[in-house]
C-alpha cells in the first residue's frame, strides 16, 4: 500500500473514532460511476488528436448530525481502458453545509454539478476525466432569481520540486422572467518552486478569463423541452512576470441549445482575437471558431444519465470532428436516526 493510501486509511480510522463518540447521527453512502469514451480527431486544426476511454468509480460514506451539516469520506478511482493498472486514486474528504440557500464546501470534493456550468472556453471538459475533485473551498448562494458562487482550487502545493499553482473562480446569474444575465471569471496563479535559484526557471504566470453574457430561456414558450439562446463578450488575460505584461485578447461569443425528446442540438460561435486560457479549450486560440453538436440522451432514469454527442469543429480552413459517449450512474441512501 502506498504512503498516500496509508495516510488516507489512518484519516478515515480517526474520523470514525471521532464520529462514534458523537451523539446520534445519520449515516449514509453514495457511489458515483462515470464511464466515458471520447474520440477526438483534431489533426486538421493542428491540435492534438487522441482517444480517451475509461471509467471512474467514487464510493463515499456520509455522516450527518442534522439536515445542514455533512461529512463525506471516500476515494475516486480511475481506470483507463487498456492500461495495466489504475492510473489514479484520489481521496474525497470534505465537509458540506447546506441551509437557507447557502451551500459551503471545504476539503477535496467532486467538481461535478458545482463547476459544470462553466463555458468550455474557460474550463475544458477534459478536466472531468482527469481532475474530478476540487481541492480547496467553495461557497454558493442561490434562489429562484439570483445565484452566486466563489471557489478556490489548489492544484499544486509549493515544494522544492513542485511549483505553486491554484485557481480561483467567481460565477453567477440573475434571472428576470425568461431573461438572464450571467458571468464567469477565473484566475490561475502559477508560481515558482520553493527556494529556487535557477535562472532558467519559468517566471510567475497569471492567467484567466472573464465572460459576461445575456440570454433568454424560451423553454416554457416553445414546444421544445429546452431552448436557450445567449451571447456576450469574453476576455482572457495573461502575463509572464519579467517577460511580458498583461495581454488581453477578447471577442464575442454566442450559444444556442435546443432539446426535444432526448435529442439536442447545440452551437457555439466565437469571433475575435485568439484566447490563451490555460485551462480552456484550445480551439479558442483561433480567432474564428464554431462548434456544432448533435446529441442523444438514450438513458435517463433515477440517477442514470447517458449522452452521445457528435461534434464538428470549424476553424479557418479546417473542419474537425469528435465523438463522445458518457454515462453517469449515482446511487446512495442516507439512514436517518431518531433523536
Residue ranges and their predicted role:
Residues 24-98, 323-331, 338:
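Beta-barrel outer-membrane channel/assembly domains of diderm bacteria
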Residues 1-30, 139, 321-339:
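Bacterial Sec-dependent N-terminal signal peptides
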Residues 54, 92, 143-161, 167-339:
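Exposed, low-structure sequence patches enriched in small/polar residues
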Residues 43-47, 120-122, 196-199:
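Flexible, solvent-exposed loop segments that connect beta-strands
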Residues 53, 85-87, 131, 164, ...:
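Short, glycine/acidic-rich beta->alpha junctions
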Residues 103-173, 184:
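Surface-exposed coil loops of outer-membrane beta-barrel proteins
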Residues 38-40, 113-117, 191-193:
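Short acidic/His/Gly/Ser-rich catalytic and metal-binding motifs that mark active-site loops
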Residues 62-68, 76, 87-103, 109-112, ...:
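Subset of outer-membrane beta-barrel
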Amino acid at each position: 500500500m502506498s504512503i498516500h493510501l496509508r495516510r488516507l486509511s489512518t484519516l478515515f480510522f480517526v474520523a470514525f473514532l471521532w464520529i462514534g463518540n458523537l451523539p446520534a447521527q445519520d449515516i449514509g453512502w453514495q457511489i458515483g460511476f462515470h464511464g466515458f469514451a471520447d474520440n477526438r480527431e483534431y489533426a486538421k486544426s493542428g491540435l492534438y488528436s487522441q482517444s480517451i476511454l475509461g471509467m471512474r468509480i467514487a464510493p463515499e460514506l456520509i455522516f450527518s448530525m442534522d439536515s445542514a451539516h455533512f461529512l463525506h469520506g471516500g476515494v475516486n478511482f480511475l481506470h483507463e481502458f487498456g492500461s495495466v493498472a489504475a492510473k489514479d486514486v484520489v481521496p474525497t474528504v470534505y465537509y458540506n453545509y447546506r441551509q437557507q440557500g447557502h451551500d459551503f464546501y471545504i476539503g477535496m470534493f467532486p467538481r461535478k454539478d458545482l463547476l459544470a456550468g462553466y463555458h468550455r472556453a474557460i474550463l475544458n471538459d477534459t478536466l472531468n476525466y482527469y481532475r474530478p475533485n476540487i481541492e480547496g473551498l467553495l461557497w454558493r448562494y442561490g434562489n429562484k432569481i439570483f445565484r452566486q458562487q466563489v471557489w478556490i482550487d489548489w492544484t499544486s502545493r509549493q515544494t522544492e520540486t513542485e511549483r505553486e499553482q491554484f485557481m480561483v473562480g467567481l460565477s453567477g446569474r440573475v434571472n428576470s422572467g425568461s431573461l438572464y444575465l450571467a458571468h464567469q471569471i477565473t484566475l490561475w496563479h502559477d508560481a515558482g518552486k520553493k527556494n529556487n535559484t535557477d535562472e532558467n526557471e519559468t517566471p510567475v504566470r497569471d492567467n484567466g478569463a472573464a465572460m459576461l453574457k445575456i440570454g433568454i430561456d424560451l423553454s416554457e414558450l416553445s414546444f421544445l423541452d429546452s431552448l436557450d439562446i445567449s451571447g456576450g463578450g469574453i476576455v482572457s488575460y495573461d502575463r509572464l512576470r519579467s517577460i511580458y505584461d498583461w495581454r488581453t485578447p477578447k471577442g464575442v461569443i454566442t450559444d444556442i441549445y435546443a432539446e426535444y425528446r432526448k435529442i439536442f442540438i447545440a452551437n457555439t460561435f466565437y469571433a475575435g482575437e485568439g484566447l490563451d486560457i490555460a485551462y480552456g479549450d484550445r480551439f479558442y486560440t483561433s480567432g474564428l471558431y464554431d462548434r456544432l453538436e448533435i446529441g442523444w440522451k438514450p438513458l435517463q432514469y433515477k440517477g442514470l444519465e447517458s449522452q452521445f454527442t457528435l461534434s464538428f469543429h470549424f476553424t479557418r480552413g479546417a473542419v474537425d470532428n469528435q465523438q463522445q459517449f458518457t454515462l453517469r450512474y449515482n446511487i446512495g441512501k442516507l439512514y436517518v436516526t431518531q433523536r
